[in-house]
């Protein structure tokens, strides 16, 4: 490593051929691309001795990344997981002006007459080429929200909140209000004191 203050990983460390001894002690993390949750559990519950990180997961192609909530729950319930990096940030396309319907046109995968290309496989980001969010980014943002409601006692009108931030008291930035409606009409509303 050029910088000893940085953690090292090597995704291909998972591939062994059984013909030679591999030396992985210099790696700080065990990393994988696209493992299932059961594969991660097998490593963690087995003899895995390094923190587990997904160097790619939840491919954002098509109508977005899937299983984000399942992965979040797994990361949260296993201390040896470090989370992961969703593939990928931005659709790769070239702006070609406005179409007849006045919508933006983007070229990709053969649109410029090239013979060798990746088709629509370059359109796999969390944002469009102009950086507008896809629905997948909004889902990802929601999954990683800093505070969640984890319970509600209807009898006593008590909400239970879970603060996922390590160093911030939710009272420092969160305000809570409510509205109770009946047939679209507000019956009552108010503010709620935020617990620490």
Feature locations, PLM:
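Extended substrate-binding grooves/exosites of carbohydrate-active enzymes
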Residues: 1-160, 164-172, 177-185
